[in-house]
Amino acid sequence: MKALILVGGYGTRLRPLTLSTPKPLVDFCNKPILLHQVEALAAAGVDHVILAVSYMSQVLEKEMKAQEQRLGIRISMSHEEEPLGTAGPLALARDLLSETADPFFVLNSDVICDFPFQAMVQFHRHHGQEGSILVTKVEEPSKYGVVVCEADTGRIHRFVEKPQVFVSNKINAGMYILSPAVLQRIQLQPTSIEKEVFPIMAKEGQLYAMELQGFWMDIGQPKDFLTGMCLFLQSLRQKQPERLCSGPGIVGNVLVDPSARIGQNCSIGPNVSLGPGVVVEDGVCIRRCTVLRDARIRSHSWLESCIVGWRCRVGQWVRMENVTVLGEDVIVNDELYLNGASVLPHKSIGESVPEPRIIM
């Protein structure tokens, strides 16, 4: 079985992290976002993953070729010369996707969840039509485009954009299974699968919705990235608690790479991820943060709701909060306060940032 993952965007919502690394390779809970998806696909029996790429494609190709042998699957690149939306990439990869009559997965690369791929295959084969989409329930459907479907069969009747009166609380979760016949519906041009292809399929009775059980998050922007981390760590607590850290100073769900080092009298957690080579010095407090590879947090600093990029250096007695994001290789000098700062890569911060802003 095959899968196409849409990884061609510029990752603008996740800047400054994506200024130096393509978004699919940004580490989420100590593993690239893309690798969470590819490993789950391989475990579900997918043997060929196609990446619809454009921005920084050479970096992606190098990394995924290294993973190809480890996972024992084929990974191909489909290069977009111009942005093709969410349906155009399927037309571009038509020859690869239609090599067999088997249905194939299509994934949005921003999504993190429990990835129920085997259940999706069973659901798709059971109803026997052209398309299946995964849907998830939300508390405020008026903020989203919602899916209106039959409760018992899942057959989709229509899509409603940001409804002001309640019609459904289910939204598109960004994961699909499609039969090769769908490729005949798509031209090689910029096209939205959600707005131009799916509504027609729904009218023809060819599209069904399967409801996702468990957590789901689009982690394409920093505040949602942190929320997604919290949900992922809670899922680990329930399913693989042995992967989480415990011991003196560890509070709640905390994921620590074996090569990371934590000093004395620290308070780490709840909801913290520390990547490979991270050093946390004595007396540091970290809550609801992710700290990426080879970063160092010096003594007595306090971090809450932050993303600390690769190889950053945070000084002593620093306070950072309110979705502060440090790009790669940022230095924060001692005794500073950063409130909602977004700092571009390779910057040195010498004064406090009391109000949210971008540091260029």
UniProtKB/Swiss-Prot annotation:
Keyword Oxidoreductase attached: no
Pathway: Nucleotide-sugar biosynthesis; GDP-alpha-D-mannose biosynthesis; GDP-alpha-D-mannose from alpha-D-mannose 1-phosphate (GTP route): step 1/1
Nucleotidyltransferase among keywords: yes
Subcellular location: Cytoplasm
Gene Ontology terms describing biological process: GDP-mannose biosynthetic process; GDP-mannose biosynthetic process from mannose; GDP-mannose metabolic process; protein glycosylation
Reactions catalysed: alpha-D-mannose 1-phosphate + GTP + H(+) = GDP-alpha-D-mannose + diphosphate
GO CC aspect terms: cytoplasm; cytosol; GDP-mannose pyrophosphorylase complex
Role, per record: Catalytic subunit of the GMPPA-GMPPB mannose-1-phosphate guanylyltransferase complex. Catalyzes the formation of GDP-mannose, an essential precursor of glycan moieties of glycoproteins and glycolipids. Can catalyze the reverse reaction in vitro. Together with GMPPA regulates GDP-alpha-D-mannose levels.
Self-association state and partner proteins as the record states: Component of the GMPPA-GMPPB mannose-1-phosphate guanylyltransferase complex composed of 4 GMPPA subunits and 8 GMPPB subunits; the complex is organized into three layers, a central layer made up of 2 GMPPA dimers sandwiched between two layers each made up of 2 GMPPB dimers. GMPPB catalytic activity is reduced when part of the complex and binding of GDP-alpha-D-Mannose by GMPPA induces allosteric feedback inhibition of GMPPB.
Domain note: The N-terminal substrate-binding domain adopts a Rossman-like fold and has a binding pocket for GTP or GDP-alpha-D-mannose. Substrate binding is coordinated by an Mg(2+) ion.
Name of the molecule in the record: Mannose-1-phosphate guanylyltransferase catalytic subunit beta
